[in-house]
């Protein structure tokens, strides 16, 4: 009978003998449970034999699954640490996880930070599923790696011209890590990325992290539209400003918009005032949906020169499908008129 039992154990545990560790976990777990139903005297040394192979297989399987999913290896490592906490394989869990985290943290500074941060996110989830006392410090290390990686990924996407993805990544970074010293710069890059998605010239370089010295020129933006407007701008400085709806303002025809908008004497148009250093700027006028969900956003570029005060007017053009498209407004502003391009949107 013992010889037949040995043959049985060998047959059931064959995946372990073949080093197919993930496939070996279930049959080894079954063999380990047999002393609960079979006389231990009959089993002899076989009663304790599955412990070592099962611990080894749980470890090897967990390692093979690291990085392969949102919590790769967590189930195997968790079972190992709970069932065989003093085993040699259990003592290897923290070192191997630490080594993997360190490797991905280093990759954040490389050519593909986005791939590195996704791997770090999976490692962080794996660590979070394990007993903290058995993987000390690794949750903090992985979390810091994800934080650095999210920022690096957003910057990388901006520099690669993937502006919509850059905006999403850096908006998330700024919301998640409000106390991070890079949050303000992340918001600036996200603004520039949103503008660049409509006007690629705005994405040729990252926004400056600091504010330039020297004189500032005033830009007064008026809203002659029945819907609110958010104005995004980037250049020597980057930011946003929101204008309230003009309650009694109407849409213009294509023929009258550029000559009549913001021209009613004494009318109190909603206004915003910006103080801008000289330089080239890119603007995105985002019309709200209060008046019509079909109002388009509009992007433009202008140059701010020293010694001038500038104005800009935003308005909405009513356009039928039979009317021709409006021409693109000029990119460069000649300061003789002291006025930025008038930002009209059509619907």
Locate predicted features.
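Hydrophobic beta-strand residues in large extracellular and virion-surface proteins
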Residues: 24, 31, 62, 166, ...
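Extracellular secreted precursors and ectodomains with disulfide-bonded cysteine-rich loops/domains
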Residues: 20-22, 59, 112, 244-247, ...
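Primarily secretory-pathway and cell-envelope proteins
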Residues: 48, 87-90, 95, 99, ...
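Disulfide-rich extracellular modules and peptides
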Residues: 24, 116, 248-251, 264, ...
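Generic detector of contiguous secondary-structure segments
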Residues: 215-222, 266-275
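An anionic, turn-rich surface loop/hairpin at beta-sheet edges
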Residues: 252-268
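A short tyrosine-centered beta-strand micro-motif
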Residues: 259, 268-270, 274-292
